[in-house]
């Protein structure tokens, strides 16, 4: 239920972890990125 997080390939959990997952499926390091959110779209625990 996790996806790689950017270059360091750490795992993404919920938004409190290292990154957020955008609807495009790309992991971004911050909620401030355009198109990103703290939703659980790709964060199924």
From Swiss-Prot:
Tissue: Expressed by the venom duct.
Protein's recorded name: Iota-conotoxin-like R11.12
Keywords tagged on the record: D-amino acid, Disulfide bond, Ion channel impairing toxin, Neurotoxin, Secreted, Toxin, Voltage-gated sodium channel impairing toxin
Source organism of the structure: Conus radiatus (Rayed cone)
TM segment ranges: none
Task of the protein: Iota-conotoxins bind to voltage-gated sodium channels (Nav) and act as agonists by shifting the voltage-dependence of activation to more hyperpolarized levels. Produces general excitatory symptoms.
Family: Belongs to the conotoxin I1 superfamily.
InterPro entries found in the cross-reference section: Conotoxin-I_CS, Toxin_19
Source taxon at top rank: Eukaryota
Domain comment quoted from the record: The cysteine framework is XI (C-C-CC-CC-C-C).
GO cellular component assignments: extracellular region
Lineage: Eukaryota, Metazoa, Spiralia, Lophotrochozoa, Mollusca
Pfam families found in the cross-reference section: Toxin_19
Keyword Disulfide bond: yes
Localization annotation: Secreted
GO MF: sodium channel regulator activity; toxin activity
Post-translational modification D-leucine, affected residues: 43
Propeptide: 45
Disulfide bonds: 5-19, 12-22, 18-27, 21-36
Predominant location: secreted
PROSITE patterns membership: I_CONOTOXIN (PS60019)
């Amino acid at each position: 239920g996790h996806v790689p997080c950017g270059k360091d390939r750490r795992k993404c959990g919920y938004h409190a972890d290292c990154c957020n997952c955008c609807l495009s499926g790309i992991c971004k390091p911050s909620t401030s990125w355009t198109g990103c959110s703290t939703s659980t779209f790709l964060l199924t625990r």
